[in-house]
Amino acid sequence: MINLRKTHPLMKIINHSFIDLPAPSNISAWWNFGSLLGACLIIQILTGFFLAMHYTSDTLTAFSSVAHICRDVNYGWLIRNLHANGASMFFMCLFLHIGRGIYYGSYLYKETWNIGVILLLTVMATAFVGYVLPWGQMSFWGTTVITNLLSAIPYIGTTLAEWIWGGFAVDKATLTRFFAFHFILPFIIMALAMVHLLFLHETGSNNPTGINPDSDKIPFHPYYTIKDALGMTLLLLVLLLLALFSPDSLGDPDNFSPANPLNTPPHIKPEWYFLFAYAILRSIPNKLGGVLALLASILILLIMPLLHTANQRSMMFRPVSQTLFWILAADLITLTWVGGQPVEQPYIIIGQLASMLYFLLILILMPLAGMFENYMLKPKW
């Protein structure tokens, strides 16, 4: 009898994607984050589904419905904490996954990379609309500040902002539609993730050396299934430690107060995973300029393949590029820290310098480093 997994139309797809898939023999732990992101997405959809059963998207009852989930629903506190901290784990994995792609030159798989950038934007949109739902002070004011940025767009800005709000300010209509968006977007993310994998499987995985691995492939199962299982166990361990021991450490204390349009919190700031972009936005004194810089900070990833000047794909054997890469990582951590600080000196100047360095590194210094390394590798005799 021929093996069912190789003949059945549905099983065949699963088989070619997760079982008999030829994979490079040398991919490191940095290649675990793709599967971890898949795990995060499933955790978020499941916990979100159970939260949606008890949540009400109305300005009068949203805050108390979240309190009701935590107090009266069986394990509601756990479901909510897993969902809130699951978002942080999701972004942690996302940033490491993108960092891996930059370090090892995975962006040269252009279709996979571009779908990945679209995925990043979709996940950011989902997290943003989700943060509004508990209807706490930071939910309300964070949404007000960020959606207000649309009004910086010339001519159509104000109309656009009011269209998104469903009125003249963030209110009941905004909350209801954001709940609808927050419910539908994860399924769009799931579909995009499948397209992401489809494009990846057209070329096969990259590997740490950046050299074509076709001559030395191993089956995905059991080697990488067990490796992914280990990664998922560690992810779950960290998530449970967060959710059970310090569930509120990554949140904002202001969000324990119900939304009040008449009282502005002293420091309006988004969740930690948006702080780097928020710092770039704030570093430009002009509203429209800030919005453009904010967009550029993410969309710059799309031109990454065009900025690749090195003859080698990976940074594994390129010490100059490696140094710049880790400076970029440190710069992003600096931006994240600055984004959470009040708008005063010395944070303003640090934020402006870090923002300049971010664009300088990606657009000029890293391409120059690639050219320099090419020159250094040329025989000089």
From Swiss-Prot:
SUPFAM superfamilies: a domain/subunit of cytochrome bc1 complex (Ubiquinol-cytochrome c reductase), Transmembrane di-heme cytochromes. Keywords: Electron transport, Heme, Iron, Membrane, Metal-binding, Mitochondrion, Mitochondrion inner membrane, Respiratory chain, Transmembrane, Transmembrane helix, Transport, Ubiquinone. This is Cytochrome b. Heme b b566 binds at H97, H196. Heme b b562 binds at H83, H182. Heme 1 (or BL or b562) is low-potential and absorbs at about 562 nm, and heme 2 (or BH or b566) is high-potential and absorbs at about 566 nm. Belongs to the cytochrome b family. The keyword Zinc does not apply. Pfam families: Cytochrom_B_C (PF00032), Cytochrome_B (PF00033).
